[in-house]
Amino acid sequence: MKQCILKAASVTLPLVLRTKGKQHLSILIYHRVLPKYDFMRPSEPTIKEFDWHMSLVSRCFTPLSLARALELMDRGELPENAICVTFDDGYADNESCALPILKKWNIPATVFVATGFINGGRMWNDTVVETIKCAGEYIDLRKVGLDEYTFNDSQSKRIVAQKILTKIKHREVEHRAEAVDFIESLAEQLLPNDLMATDQQILNLEAAGVEIGGHTVNHPILAKLNDRHAQQEIVDGKKHLETIIGKKLRYFAYPNGKLGDDYLESQVRIVKEAGFEAAVSTTWGVSARNSDRFQLARFTPWDKRSGKFLLRLLLNQKSVKL
C-alpha cells in the first residue's frame, strides 16, 4: 500500500503543482549523511534514508548543478520542479557516504566547506555533541554560564546538547570558544577527529563533478564580526579552497544563514567583492529570476517518511509549510 501511495504521489503531485514549479528553483540543504543512525543527530539522514531522498529527487524533480540552474534561471528557462542539492560545512561523509549515492542517481551537488576544520579538525557544535554523547549521568557547566545537567537516557542527552548549542551559538566568538573548550575538557573519552573532510576528500568530490563552495574559515556568526574580520573569514576561506582544488570558487554559503541574525547586508557586499558569483542563505522558500543572487533561499528536508518528504519538497515550490 505504501508503495502504491508513493507511486501515485510521485505522478500526481508534480502535475498538480506544475504551474507553480515553473521558473522556481528549490535548493536543498544537507550537512551530513551518516553510515548509521545517531541518536544525537536524529535529523541527519542515514545512507539508506539519503538514498531514497535522492531517488525521489531524481524521479520527481529536475536536479541541476547550481551553476546550470542559475544559468537557466537568468535566461528564464528553468525546467519544471528544478532542484539543487547542497551540503554545508565539509564533513568527511559527504565524500564517503553521500557521493556514491549522488553518483548512483546522477545528481549534481555543491559542498560548502569551512576550511578551519578540515584535515582532522572538529566544528564547535560537534565538540559539544560528542562530549555530551559520552558523558556519564551528570555534567556541571555553570562555570561557562550554563547549568547543571543530569542524564537519564539518550533522549535527555540529545535535548541537553541542543539546549547548549542554542544558548552559546550567538555568543561572541571568543566567549563561545571558551565555553566549548571547557565543555571539551570534561569529555570522558577522546573525541573523534575524523568528522571533517581532508584535502584529498575535497579533491575527490571536485574530481567527481561536485562544486566546492566557500563557507568561511571558522564558521562564525558573521553578524557578530566587524566588516574587516568578516572579510578575512570569507576571503581566507575562499583562497584556501582555491589552493586545494586549483580553480576559482564561484559560490558561498553564509554560516547559519539568516539575514540579520547570522549575517548583515554589509557582508553580502563583502561576498560580492570577494569575487563570488552567487551565495545561498538558509531562508526557506524558492528562488526565481528576480531573486537576489547573493541571498538565494534554501530548504531543509527532514521527514523520515517518503510520502511526506516528497509532499514537503513539492509544496516548497509554492513556499507552503506543512
Where are these regions (language model features)?
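Short beta-alpha junction loops
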Residues: 115-119, 285
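CE4/NodB-like, metal-dependent polysaccharide N-deacetylase domain
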Residues: 28, 78-79, 91, 99-112, ...
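Generic enzyme active-site microenvironment
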Residues: 86-87, 213
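Generic beta-sheet signal
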Residues: 112-114, 215, 282
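Extended, charge-rich helix/loop segments that form flexible
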Residues: 20, 121-208
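C-terminal active-site subregion of NodB/CE4 polysaccharide deacetylases
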Residues: 1-86, 93, 124-133, 140-141, ...
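Conserved radical SAM core fold
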Residues: 32-34, 118, 214-221
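Residues within well-ordered alpha-helices
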Residues: 53, 98, 198-201, 267
